[in-house]
Amino acid sequence: MKNITVIGGGVLGSQIAFQTSYSGKKCTVYVMDDKCKMELITKLDALKDNYIMAIKDMADKKDWCRGISDYDTFDKDKCLEMVQKGYDNIVIETDLSKAVSEADLVIESITEDFNIKRNFYEKLSKLLPEKTIVVTNSSTMLPSKLCKYTGRENMFLALHFANSIWKNNVVEVMKHSKTDDKYFKMVMEFGKEINMIPLPIEKEKSGYLLNSMLIPFLFSSLDLLVNGISDVESIDKAWKYGTGAPEGPFEILDKVGLVTAYNIVEMYVKIPSFLAPYNFKGISKMLKVYIDKGKTGKSSGEGFYKYCD
């Protein structure tokens, strides 16, 4: 698959686009309007700097980013050239029909809201070429819940990336009962072609592999905060210094984005308090306060922490 369209220019959408273009694919990103386009350009500028910095660190053997290059084939100058070409070749489009007109693969990476996704897929289904495979990067929604809105159930599946994909280069490939094995294998191969490690998921599971482990961890951390057990910094330190992990849960939440976290929590707020394993209602209210103040995470300059340019 050569022509790839990414839908959405958020945290992961921008990363998927950059990695895809870096790997030599023709990549188009669809965003809703010029404001979103400018926000995406800012993200792509930052990603370019991140890749360049990572390559220099790799050359000095300080760190390794498997999404950029294997250890045995690493060539600093070649990788830097690929970064510039990848950056230059990304096309940003605000017309959906133009964005998908030649797509072999469409990767949807929009807000974790079922109604928004459903409405988008209903619109998309009327515009797609017959050849196009469609995947969702949804963190939590099962492809079987969305497939009927795509108009191509057998060509639809999930392709879920981890954050900082140039470094954390795993991608989860999950089919549903109507996914044709031919397209499942094609998406697995695409993962390899953009230097990811594709992890096959043969049976649907909300949260896939990574988030089935990550989301309860983040819920536990938010629960400690909202119930007044401890503060953000102390909870992060407990995890980092206690396990040797590079990031604490609230640093992870700021990278993921508090809007995404809020939308996931909202799926659980109707669980009766006496049955809920966490204080979902309290967590939802707390996150809403941050979001209403514009503190949506690292991309906005502030979430649980403040970030300098």
Predicted regions, residues:
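NAD(P)+-binding Rossmann beta1-loop-alpha1 motif at the extreme N-terminus of oxidoreductases
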Residues: 1-71, 127
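Structural motif
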Residues: 7, 15, 86, 93, ...
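Short glycine/serine/threonine-rich phosphate/pyrophosphate-binding segments
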Residues: 13-16, 115-119, 141-143
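Rossmann-like NAD(P)-binding element
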Residues: 35, 50-133
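Rossmann-fold dinucleotide-binding core
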Residues: 133-202
